[in-house]
Design a protein with these regions (language model features):
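Extreme N-terminal tail/first-helix region
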Residues: 19-37
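Bacterial Sec-dependent N-terminal signal peptides
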Residues: 1-23
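Short, contiguous alpha-helical
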Residues: 24, 36-45, 49-52, 59-101, ...
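Acidic/histidine-rich alpha-helical segments that form the ligand environment
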Residues: 104-137, 147
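Amphipathic, well-packed alpha-helical segments that form the structural scaffold of globular domains
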Residues: 49, 53-57, 125-128, 132
């Protein structure tokens, strides 16, 4: 019996040794994964691109009458804050902002819905490229902010999905299975 157990352990060890080792995650890979799953990769939740896909300007402007934001306002808010923090990350001068967060929602223009969708995709893509190009020192100093950006995006994407469900414009087949 001891011989069988020994041979089994030895065989499994050889098999494990013969396999290529899994690369351990890095700070960069973790941050990129968080950014991508809130942008265009469906993992634990629906990404932004899927959340806004196929919406008309009218659907994006719809409000529930209870003081909540529209999908367009939420998308506009996401574009603003992602761009604001990306600008800082790149070391560029930030856009003049008086600190009133309400204006990041209220500047939404129904006529510009398609442009807002494109801007959201673009800024999320730019974040991924910027993190990919950044060195470890920069990522270490920014990791908390970037992680919060991913969380912030996921929070508002969840709101977008909820609003779509309320208005009847959400296709459950696009959800996470």
């Amino acid at each position: 019996m001891k011989t069988i157990v020994f041979c089994l352990v030895l065989s499994l060890s050889c098999l494990a040794f013969g396999q290529s080792p899994k690369t351990p995650p890095t700070l960069k890979s973790i941050l990129l994964e968080q950014l991508k799953t809130t942008h265009n990769q469906k993992e634990w939740f629906v990404p932004a691109n899927t959340a806004v896909e196929g919406l008309t300007p009218e659907q994006a402007s719809w409000r529930d009458g209870k003081g909540n934001h529209s999908i367009g306002q939420l998308a506009n808010h996401l574009v603003f804050w992602n761009q604001e923090e990306l600008t800082k990350f790149k070391g560029e001068p930030p856009v003049k902002f008086d600190g009133n967060n309400d204006e990041t929602f209220n500047n939404f223009d129904t006529k510009k819905w398609n442009a807002t969708v494109q801007q959201l995709d673009q800024v999320l893509t730019e974040w991924e490229k910027a993190v990919e190009a950044a060195d470890d020192k920069k990522l270490e100093s920014w990791c908390s902010i970037i992680a919060h950006i991913g969380t912030h995006n996921a929070y508002h994407i969840g709101q977008i999905i909820y609003i779509r469900k309320l208005q009847g414009s959400w296709d459950p087949e696009k959800g996470v299975k």
